[in-house]
Swiss-Prot record:
Induction: Induced as part of the humoral response to a bacterial invasion.
InterPro entries: Cecropin, Cecropin_insect
Name under which the protein is recorded: Cecropin-C
Main localization category: secreted
Species lineage: Eukaryota, Metazoa, Ecdysozoa, Arthropoda, Hexapoda
Length: 63
């Protein structure tokens, strides 16, 4: 019975320590994904601006 309690306690300590070390790795991955999303958003906004300018030039050329 005592062995079981000690085993559970050690298992919990290991799970907590492994969980904390994994959080750093997961946080880095999350930041990379967030950065990719920001770059995609910025490129889309820039592309829409260029497309709007092209549409204005085409409309002006038609008269």
């Amino acid at each position: 019975m005592n062995f079981y309690k000690i085993f559970v306690f050690v298992a919990l300590i290991l799970a907590i320590s492994i969980g904390q070390s994994e959080a750093g790795w997961l946080k880095k991955l999350g930041k990379r994904i967030e950065r990719i999303g920001q770059h995609t958003r910025d490129a889309t906004i820039q592309g829409l601006g260029i497309a709007q300018q092209a549409a204005n030039v085409a409309a002006t050329a038609r008269g």
